[in-house]
Amino acid sequence: MKPSPRTPAHPRHPVALATFLVFGLAQAATAADDALLAAAPAGQHTLQAVTVTATMTEQEARTAPASVTVVTEEELAQRNAANLLDAVRGTPGVTFQGRQVGGRKTLALRGMEGKHTLTLIDGRRISASDDVIGHSDYQYGWLPMAAVERVEIIRGPLSALYGSEALGGVINLITKKPKDRWMASIGLSGATGLDSDTAADALRTSVYAAGPLGEQFNLAINAEKSYQGSTVLPEDRAQSEIEGNRTRSLGLTASWQPVAGHEVEFGVQDGLEKRDSDDINRTPTYYHNRYELDRTQKHASWNADWGNGWRSQLRAYRSDISIRNFRNNGVAATRPQDMRDSVVDGHASTRWGSHQITVGGEWRKEELVNAGLKNGQDEATHKALFVQDEFALGQNLMATLGLRGDHHEIFGSEVSPRAYLVWEASPNLVVKGGYGHAFKAPTLKQISPNYVGAEGPHSFLGNGNIQPETSNAFELGANWQAAPQLALRATVFHTEVKQLITYRLLQKIGPRSIYQYDNVDAARIQGLEAGFTWDITPRLQWNNDATWLHTRDKTTGQQLNDRPRVAWNSTLVWQVQQWRTQLGAETTGKQQSASGELPAYTLWNASVGRAWKLGGERQLHLSTGIQNLGNVRMQEESPNFGWAEQGRRFFVNARMDF
């Protein structure tokens, strides 16, 4: 007999509970410290965010030719971020879409699917597995957060620089770099579910160390091991609602400066992740389901400053991901799959009068091993050249023009132009906007005419005539420091997407449907991002960012599925010297799914953190808090949600820097 569904555990007043927790703790903390510490002036703790992703050159995010959000190392710790999804949640334009398996979800930028976001590590692309492997979310665990200095999020197309996949935007994980002396940090993070039915325990340990080896050599090492338990499905406790996982990763980077201005770097990042869940198939048969994901990225690079404004970079790197599935009770496992991306790229930049010119190229070979392909494998080669010009049109007006040409050995060529203007109207007002074309190449499964995927109840066939997905996007935005204590920001955007790849029904043979990949859909996505940061007092700051979306499937005339009409993130931050206390709310509005309309919901999070100086370079960082204060369970909000969230959990993070 199956157990009855549990009674919803939503507190009647989660806001009151959160406010008491956060500001009660903060009041106690400040009372203890006020005799020794003076309040920090507003903004004293905030450094100007920088980005290298928008143009491949470092510049302030405020005046960069793109819509940019930078998540700092401090914010990663405060969010208890275990992976990239945790790192970017709560940032403007980011929402989630379900993968229907194991509680998995992927991110969407401005309503564009996860497959339309290019993920980079220090500018190096990783294997884009989410569109190749069904129901997967494997792109978000390539790098431990202990090795990350910041995460740069670019909303809007950037194929003019990076090529395929950058329709919705680019997320670039910037790793920590060695300093002129040895530095190290040891981290320990734990979480425990306050309701064992909805949240599972977790534990994560990490080590990072970097420093010089003599005058010309540097070394950086990162290691992490983590455990996340699975949660049961309350309606059937023999099944898992959220899969568990165990991970271990190790990274090593060595660099050499043979002469001033030149650096040669070699590195490897390796990780193994094991996921476990209990499931049921259509028979119905209960079975234990395990996935093993083996990820490796190796790279070599040469960065050179030639003087007189000339700089160059040359890189070679390879990304590999191997997926293996194991099932018991006579249930057939999914096919083994191996993906490899081998890349050689480079670019050079120089100043020429008021122009900053960047030219570069890329050669990339993607390979896929899958039994559904002819001879069990396939490959495709990409070649590209690009040019970018940043120049002044006046004292306070900057223009960025870019053009990239990509050639794919199967479908042919695609040209991606870009034009952007940034007007610094005053020291307090920046207006910027532009246009960009972007594309996503078909996967090897989609474009291979001999591919047959027939593992589930349906069959999917490749199509040698398929074309890349393309988009044309426009945006116009402004950032205004309206008063010393108030910053306002807003951006409108409009995107036309064509040649969207989906599948069409060819025929039915008994209960089995036969589908073929094809370009059949077109869509329009437009909306508004707006927000403000208000220093209510020198100690108290209120951040708000909201995104309104209007979407349309131009083939059917219907709203696109899994795109919330409104997403609103609100955070109160109380900062007193080393103390940082915050209360956050992530509200996701109503949205349409394939099974009907999904209701709006809000996740509340609260945390308190502090850093202690222990003498010399030693610092102790502690943070603690509660995630999902309201204990929201997606399946109780609606059974049509395609993913799950951990229930109410208490967490503690500790990190020692020395």
Across the structure, where does each feature detected by a protein language model lie?
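Short acidic/polar hinge/loop motifs at secondary-structure boundaries
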Residues: 125-155
